[in-house]
Amino acid sequence: MQIEMTIKGLMVDPITNMPIVILRDKEGQRVLPIWVGIFEANAIALQIENISTPRPMTHDLLRNVIHDLKAAVQKVVVCDLQENTFYALIYLSLNGDTLAIDARPSDAIALALRTRAPIFVEDTVIDHAKTVDFTSEKNDADRLHKWLESLDPDDLGKYKM
């Protein structure tokens, strides 16, 4: 089952210093942190903060190409988690057909923000992510788990990229 999510915030992992996109379901019951690259986090942050750039960035270009081809982004879905790597699909409608295009979640999310498309996560991905150790060191995993558990949901919107 797909669960609609919203971006609750962007944070920096205190252990790896990598950006994390925090997705949360509309009821506030489920949260999914997704580690992303710095450039992708910047693309997401620019859109969240409504900051325009003088020239189109990569995700703006992709949005423009999709629009000019008379296609539309229906939704993006974080659909799988394999070997500590999240996978996503971008669903495009084009000439009455629906295409599912493989993408990194960070790119799919950045595009969804630019096209106002909904973001979904398969419930199995959320369930599986709870059991996966995303860090290589046990101590780091414990520290990260405690840090994520201690987060106040109100703090998530305070961290800007």
Q: What do the predicted segments below correspond to?
A:
Residues 1-161:
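Divalent-cation
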